[in-house]
């Protein structure tokens, strides 16, 4: 692709109540002679060839330069995609936009390196940018990951708008409604090409949309400087946890009780089984103190969880080959981390949330197996517990 030319086109994001554009999404195009190279192809070629970060930086810089030439001035009037690796590497900080933009991420970014992504999202918001989750509904895992990022904007995958109603669509609608309840989040539906698509988009809760019913992508944007921008919530409080561990998060709000390790094991098994019923929409985060606490039966259960669920992370001191062999993502607990005294399991799915947190009563007498524990199903508290595990640890 050495002789290919990179350029940017813009597709409008319209207010569904008026049909008027409020913002535009920047889309990268690559042309070699008279041949237009499909975006998925040149990105896949770059990924295979190890040039993804370089290509994404070129796309980012070209989009910002073209938007500046077109006269974009208002905050959040430009939506721009960024690869997870580029976002984590701080591309937007190295080549900063002149005004706050909407940064689009897919749920695979959370699956890849959740801790780093959450930290970068908080940094982006601190700089005035907004975070959008793109292609929501394309993969079931995104439904459980949504509350961890708590985006300002969700973009519904065009499949949800264009395909016939199904049980899967109903499940996604239910999960989306549950997440949006009480939140001032903008919902953008992609792929609106017919009046029927528009009806479906509205039924899904979309307030804004994109698609050929309104306009194809264009090179020149009329009145770019007059765009109002996507209407975001008045403020977004970043949710980086103050507490360092799940036990500290939950025990501050829920009364703790004494328990023996044997009961905690059975409660953990129950929550693990509940996670498996949700399949690839489930997130499971578990701490085991020392890897020597993990029995052969537990290794087997976590191999099954890793095969079935969207994201499974195990935390322990002394990572063993048997734990790595489960297929779960494994993170070692550092010496001195208060997590070494905890037995925790956090489960998040599209329609279920639970956090079982326990702290050893006397770590110097580990053989006694005595803990204080708390169990909560309050989703907001479970999300906070999950973020405390992911922060600086995943």
Feature roles, as predicted:
Residues 81-85, 106-107, 134-136, 190-192, ...:
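Structural motif
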Residues 125, 181, 202, 306-307:
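Anion (oxyanion) recognition and catalysis
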Residues 226-394:
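Non-catalytic regulatory/interaction regions at protein termini and inter-domain linkers
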């Amino acid at each position: 692709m050495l002789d290919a030319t990179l350029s940017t086109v813009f597709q409008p994001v319209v207010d569904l109540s008026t049909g008027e554009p409020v913002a535009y999404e920047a889309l990268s195009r690559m042309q070699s002679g008279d041949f237009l190279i499909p975006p998925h192809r040149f990105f896949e070629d770059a990924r295979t060839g190890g040039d993804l970060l370089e290509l994404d930086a070129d796309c980012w810089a070209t989009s910002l330069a073209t938007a500046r030439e077109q006269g974009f001035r208002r905050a959040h009037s430009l939506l721009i995609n960024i690869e997870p690796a580029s976002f984590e590497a701080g591309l937007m900080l190295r080549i900063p936009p002149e005004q706050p933009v909407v940064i689009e991420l897919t749920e695979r970014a959370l699956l890849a390196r959740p801790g780093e992504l959450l930290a970068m999202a908080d940094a982006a918001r601190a700089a005035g940018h907004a975070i959008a989750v793109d292609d929501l509904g394309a993969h079931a895992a995104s439904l459980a990951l949504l509350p961890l990022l708590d985006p300002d904007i969700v973009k519904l995958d065009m499949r949800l708008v264009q395909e016939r109603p199904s049980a899967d669509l109903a499940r996604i609608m239910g999960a989306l409604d549950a997440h949006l309840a009480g939140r001032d989040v903008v919902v953008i539906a992609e792929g609106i090409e017919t009046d029927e698509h528009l009806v479906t988009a509205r039924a899904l809760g979309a307030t804004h949309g994109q698609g050929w019913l309104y306009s194809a992508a264009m090179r020149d944007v009329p009145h770019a400087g007059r765009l109002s921008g996507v209407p975001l919530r008045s403020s977004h409080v970043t949710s980086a946890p103050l507490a360092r561990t799940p036990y500290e998060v939950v025990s501050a709000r829920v009364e703790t009780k004494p328990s023996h390790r044997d009961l905690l094991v059975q409660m953990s098994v129950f929550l693990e089984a509940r996670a498996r019923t949700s399949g690839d929409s489930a997130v499971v985060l578990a701490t085991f103190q020392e890897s020597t606490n993990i029995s052969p039966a537990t290794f087997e259960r976590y191999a099954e969880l890793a095969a079935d669920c969207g994201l499974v992370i195990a935390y322990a001191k002394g990572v063993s080959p048997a734990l790595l062999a489960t297929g779960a993502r494994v993170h070692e607990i550092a010496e001195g981390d208060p997590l070494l005294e905890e037995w925790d399991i956090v489960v998040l799915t599209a329609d279920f949330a639970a956090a079982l947190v326990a702290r050893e009563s006397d770590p110097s007498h580990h053989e006694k197996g005595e803990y204080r524990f708390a169990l909560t199903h309050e989703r907001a508290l479970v999300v906070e517990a999950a973020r405390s595990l992911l922060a600086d640890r995943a």
